[in-house]
Design a protein with these regions (language model features):
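Active-site bordering "gate/hinge" segments
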Residues: 1-168
Length: 168
């Protein structure tokens, strides 16, 4: 059972779903629950540095990303998608035997989607980067990948139906 909102209204529904799920279990294996006190591998938290940068710096980065994407080729006629987002998450595992483990992490996601055009044909390309460090966002790589993906589709056509030799 999964929910993104845990409140009194959803609690009854979640419990009913859980009971229905339990009825579906056909395994005869005995379940084992880990207790607290056991030794577990340390998994470090990963904290992004995006909080150290102003909104103006982030907007400037996106404007630069769009400008450089458009400059790749005159066939790149517009950037249909240029996005930056920040994510912070915490994963926690708890049970009734005292186990309580957690890990938190945060990162940025940057995506660009250029539109290429030639004659009456258009094509979109997309590429992105997931990175915990703002200054390490791989703008040049995503520009290259996204524009190459869009440009590579131009001039493509359909193959006439028929029998063709296949080499292995």
């Amino acid at each position: 059972v999964y929910t993104e909102t845990l409140d009194d209204d959803t609690m009854e529904i979640l419990l009913q779903q859980l009971l229905e799920n339990v009825k579906l279990i056909s395994s005869t294996e005995e379940e084992f629950m880990y207790a607290s006190g056991a030794t577990y591998q340390e998994v470090p938290n990963l904290e992004s540095d995006y909080k150290n940068y102003s909104t103006a710096e982030k907007v400037a980065m996106l404007q630069d990303l769009e400008k450089k994407t458009l400059a790749v080729s005159p066939k790149i006629v517009k950037v249909g998608y240029c996005q930056y987002s920040e994510t912070s998450q915490k994963v926690q595992i708890m049970n009734s035997k005292g186990l309580d483990l957690s890990r938190s992490y945060s990162y940025t996601t940057t995506i660009v989607g250029p539109l290429a055009a030639e004659g009456d044909q258009t094509a979109m390309g997309f590429a992105g980067d997931i990175n915990p460090f703002f200054q390490q966002i791989e703008k040049d790589r995503i520009i290259k990948e996204a524009t190459e993906a869009a440009l590579a589709q131009l001039g493509a056509g359909f193959v006439k139906t028929g029998k063709y030799p296949v080499s292995c």
